[in-house]
Amino acid sequence: MATFKLVISDPKTGIAKQIEITGPEAEKLIGKRIGDQIPVKELGINLNELFGKEFPEDVKMEIRGGTDKDGFPMRPDIHGPRRVRILLSKGPGFRPKEKGERRKKTVRGNTISPEIVQVNVKLVY
């Protein structure tokens, strides 16, 4: 059974809240990709209680990224739930120290699997 830490960000206020989901709600996230949108009602999350303000009924969450059990970040350009070592020059998983620097880094694909522990989402109105 999957368990995820869900970091929900509200882009209008800049506030982010972290909750943990387990069971059938967490299973609904498996197989989703970065960029997919999920209705909040489908996961059974009460945003009004969590953020302390009113939200419209049709609010969706867009998956923006996450990390696996060993801390490797998800990248939107790597397809599937696999872990790979790739040569990076910028983007998620690598911050170059000097101009033109490239380095091999291990990153996770863009699909949520049971090995993922944290999922970052933003609210879409």
Curated annotation (Swiss-Prot):
InterPro entries from the UniProt entry: Ribosomal_eS6 (IPR001377), Ribosomal_eS6_arc (IPR020924), Ribosomal_eS6_CS (IPR018282)
Chain ranges passing through the membrane: none
The keyword Transport appears for this protein: no
Source organism: Pyrococcus abyssi (strain GE5 / Orsay)
Family of this protein: Belongs to the eukaryotic ribosomal protein eS6 family.
Pfam family, one: Ribosomal_S6e
Name of the protein in question: Small ribosomal subunit protein eS6
Source taxon at top rank: Archaea
